[in-house]
């Protein structure tokens, strides 16, 4: 009995192999009608499953996952294993020798409906699963439909149309399955695209190291070489992908220089010679929240909402490229005067602003916009003569025009109210002068005042290597006490050479008159001119070094004060 069993086991593989060979030949025959027995159909199925069992024992790799997926696609849609196999539509694979494979290959070469390989060929020496074949067939169907839709149907022959129809009928089940899967994937993709954004917060930082000193007679003697710093860490949060909530932490120890007259008397609080990194000093590097703003689109308009630290130059077009950098940032001009028109320094704090575009058609003045904003310095204070509307405030209106892509213009009006607190006119809502002489800034400690300011600014780029910008502003300050009225003027022009010597470098020269008051004090009617030159050298995308010189004339509008020169070496790290 055991010998008989042993011999049966030895002979069985040969019998099975012969059976499989005969079965395959019978299936490949075109007119084959012989029915296979139950055992003949089950045996090939069992043999086909054996490699899968072996593969499961091997380590799972990416290639294995791909093969398993292909096998699953191949096994989908199969009928009963005991049914008759007489049609090519019931093969799990389509061989290169099959008529369907050769017909599709001919269509591919003729119409170029599959171009997935680098050389544009179809590589017809490899077997395909029925779903892979159906995918190629679907591509050819789409290509032929495209040719017909574009009135090039004469390129498609009747023979090719007949071949496509036969292939479509032969692989109708697979085509329907694939198209169903594609529709489902497209629906899921559309859903993901519509809801792909999630609330994210991005850190944007800037650190400034600066070595600076002031020279010139008494002013030079009263000041020493200093090493100052400022750090800003901005948390930018977006909820929709189109808005941004900015929460900025700042720390710094930089202060401005003490200007002296020829009698060695301090000229007084002013913004002359003040540098951008000296704005927002927190004493001994104490950390403060110096900006809390939210910006979002509202229909065609852009809305700016400031809870703290709002500035007009946050939302209004300044038109001073290469000199202005994110409101006293570390990659523009050295001085606050060269950075932006002083009119944007009137007021600041909390409030709201809108920027509404217009003239989007074929007008030469495009794109154009109208900007309005309101900022209150003491919006959080509920005390008398304080708050959002009863304290110091500044309301801005500005028309912005662009003539082509090379010229930008802006006309600005700012109305301000200044309480009897002795705050500076150009203080950005921080009570200390940012630009201008002390006479231009001083508001009465006894009486309130109002101001109406008018400004023009322009930026012109005749070429990518040259930028010219400038501004002029006039303020009519009306005090509510005797001799409190004054007129304040300021103007300036700058020339910048971007990419000078190297991509990312900037050579800039700016000259003009700091804000000064006319006819308010005898012997103090000189125009305080200022000239600045700097060269920003780009070390990398995140580091720049800027040496520069600032020449300040007639400090305090006083002819009895010698000129002063400020030398600075600024290093800026951005991340």
From Swiss-Prot:
Membrane-spanning intervals of the chain: none
Protein's UniProt keywords contain Repeat: no
GO biological process: one example: carbohydrate transport
A Pfam family recorded for this sequence: OprB
GO annotations of cellular component type: membrane
Signal peptide: 1-28
GO MF annotation, one: porin activity
Coiled coil: 158-196
Highest rank taxon of the organism: Bacteria
The SLH domain, residue ranges: 87-151
Family, per entry: Belongs to the OprB family.
Listed PANTHER family: OUTER MEMBRANE PROTEIN ALPHA, OUTER MEMBRANE PROTEIN ALPHA-RELATED
Protein name: Uncharacterized protein alr4550
Organism of this sequence: Nostoc sp. (strain PCC 7120 / SAG 25.82 / UTEX 2576)
């Amino acid at each position: 009995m055991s010998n008989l069993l042993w011999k049966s086991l030895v002979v069985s593989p040969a019998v099975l192999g012969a059976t499989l060979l005969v079965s395959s030949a019978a299936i490949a025959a075109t007119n084959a009608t012989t029915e296979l027995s139950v055992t003949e159909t089950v045996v090939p199925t069992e043999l086909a499953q054996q490699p899968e069992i072996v593969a499961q024992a091997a380590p799972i790799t990416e290639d294995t996952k791909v093969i398993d997926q292909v096998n699953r696609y191949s096994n989908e849609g199969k009928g009963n294993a005991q049914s008759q196999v007489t049609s090519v539509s019931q093969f799990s694979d389509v061989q290169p020798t099959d008529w369907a494979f050769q017909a599709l290959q001919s269509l591919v070469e003729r119409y170029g409906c599959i171009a997935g390989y680098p050389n544009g060929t179809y590589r017809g020496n490899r077997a395909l699963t029925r779903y892979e074949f159906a995918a190629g067939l679907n591509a050819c169907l789409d290509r032929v439909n495209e040719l017909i839709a574009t009135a090039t149907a004469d390129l498609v022959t009747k023979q090719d149309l007949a071949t496509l129809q036969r292939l479509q009928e032969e692989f109708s089940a697979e085509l329907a399955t694939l198209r169903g899967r594609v529709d489902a994937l497209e629906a899921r993709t559309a859903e993901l695209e519509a809801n792909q954004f999630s609330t994210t917060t991005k850190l944007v930082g800037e650190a400034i190291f600066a070595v600076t000193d002031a020279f010139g007679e008494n002013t030079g003697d009263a000041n020493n070489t200093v090493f100052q710093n400022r750090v800003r860490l901005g948390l930018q949060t977006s909820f929709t992908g189109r808005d941004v909530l900015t929460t900025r932490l700042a720390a710094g120890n930089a202060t401005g220089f003490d200007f002296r007259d020829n009698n060695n008397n301090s000229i007084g609080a002013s913004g002359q010679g003040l540098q951008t990194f000296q704005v927002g000093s927190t004493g001994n590097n104490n950390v403060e929240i110096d900006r809390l703003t939210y910006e979002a689109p509202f229909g065609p308009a852009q809305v700016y909402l400031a809870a703290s630290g709002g500035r007009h130059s946050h939302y209004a077009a300044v038109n001073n490229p290469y000199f202005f950098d994110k409101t006293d940032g570390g990659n523009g001009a050295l001085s606050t005067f060269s950075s932006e028109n002083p009119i944007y320094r009137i007021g600041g704090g909390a409030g709201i602003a809108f920027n509404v575009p217009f003239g989007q058609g074929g007008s030469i003045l495009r794109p154009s916009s109208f900007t309005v904003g309101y900022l209150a310095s003491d919006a959080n204070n509920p005390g008398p003569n304080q708050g959002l509307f009863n304290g110091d405030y500044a309301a801005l209106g500005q028309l912005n025009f662009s003539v082509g892509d090379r010229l930008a213009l802006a006309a600005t009006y700012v109305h301000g109210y200044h309480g009897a607190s002795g705050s500076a006119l150009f203080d950005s809502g921080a009570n200390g002068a940012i630009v201008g002489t002390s006479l231009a800034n001083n508001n009465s400690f006894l009486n309130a005042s109002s101001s109406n300011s008018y400004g023009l600014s322009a930026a012109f780029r005749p070429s990518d290597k040259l930028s010219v910008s400038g501004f002029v502003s006039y303020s009519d300050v009306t005090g509510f006490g005797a001799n409190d009225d004054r007129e304040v003027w300021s103007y300036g022009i700058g020339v910048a050479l971007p990419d000078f010597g190297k991509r990312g470098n900037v050579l800039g020269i700016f000259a003009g008159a700091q804000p000064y008051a006319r006819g308010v004090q005898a012997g103090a009617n000189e125009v305080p001119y200022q000239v600045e030159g700097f060269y920003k050298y780009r070390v990398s995308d995140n580091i720049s070094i800027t040496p520069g010189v600032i020449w300040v004339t007639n400090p305090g509008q006083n002819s009895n004060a010698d000129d002063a020169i400020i030398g600075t070496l600024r290093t800026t790290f951005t991340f």
